[in-house]
């Protein structure tokens, strides 16, 4: 669940794009120095423009010397490596996300189940910090949070749209932009408080 959530919140990709990520050599490439990884989905995206076709996910390892003690535990590159190692013995599919229980053990995970993983991770994170989970939270909520935080930190709108596979900035401004510094339920995601910064 953790790696699914971290990829969702750091990439702003649709669940279909995350579900289509592959372990094939042409779709997953680690930086030689271990500083990051590039992943490509194995399907055609919803937005079929030259800009969005086969748009990769580029992840960079969090700085292990950061003053925030939890940063290393929230690093998507670290989590991805751990997940790949943990599923190596059961894997029956090149798809990145595979089932780890039930009759489909080791087989490709469905989009619906992947959505549940992300929602379960959010719910667990709130519970671990002693807070009730947001009502009506969806897997899609990660796209609003990820892109809104990016905008708040000065990332150009064109770069945000490219990462989220949106054809026009209007999609973000009308449907996804939220006030993550205010009372938006998921605004505190990946923003540790002093009470839970060591978890």
Regions found by a protein language model. Give the residues of each.
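Extended, non-catalytic subsegments within catalytic or DNA/protein-binding/adaptor domains
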Residues: 1-199
């Amino acid at each position: 669940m953790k790696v699914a959530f971290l990829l969702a919140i750091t990439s702003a990709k649709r669940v279909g794009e995350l579900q289509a990520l592959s372990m094939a050599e042409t779709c997953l490439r680690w930086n030689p120095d271990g500083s990051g990884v590039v992943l490509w989905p194995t399907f055609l995206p919803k937005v079929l423009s030259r800009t969005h076709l086969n748009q990769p996910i580029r992840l960079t390892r969090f700085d292990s010397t950061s003053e925030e003690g939890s940063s290393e535990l929230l690093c998507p590159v670290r989590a991805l490596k751990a997940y790949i190692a943990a599923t190596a013995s059961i894997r029956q599919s090149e798809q990145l996300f595979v089932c780890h229980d039930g009759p489909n053990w080791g087989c490709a995970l469905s989009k619906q189940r992947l959505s549940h993983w992300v929602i379960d991770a959010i719910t667990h994170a709130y519970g671990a910090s002693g807070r009730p989970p947001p009502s009506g939270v969806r897997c899609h909520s990660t796209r609003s949070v990820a892109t809104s935080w990016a905008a708040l930190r000065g990332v150009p709108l064109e770069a945000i749209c490219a990462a989220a596979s949106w054809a026009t900035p209007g999609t973000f401004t009308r449907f996804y932009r939220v006030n993550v510094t205010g009372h938006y339920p998921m605004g505190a995601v990946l923003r540790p408080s002093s009470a839970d910064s060591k978890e």
